[in-house]
Amino acid sequence: MKNKINLSYYGNDGKGCEYDIYENGEVTIYFMLNGIEISDVDVDLECLGCSTIEQLVIDLLNFGYKINL
């Protein structure tokens, strides 16, 4: 099992997005509707314009995402 950080954001309309950020720099983005996954995509940090995991986490927190423990 890979170690990961999960961050999510959901609007009042039930639409949302979740990021699984793995320690090796891989990222899976899930697009959600009313708690159900409707699509996902695998990318790396560079595709998101970040050079470190910390930078991506800070950017997402600044955009209103919440860390899921």
Describe the predicted segments one by one.
Residues 1-3, 65-69:
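Short intrinsically disordered terminal tails
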Residues 8-64:
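Acidic, low-complexity, intrinsically disordered interaction modules
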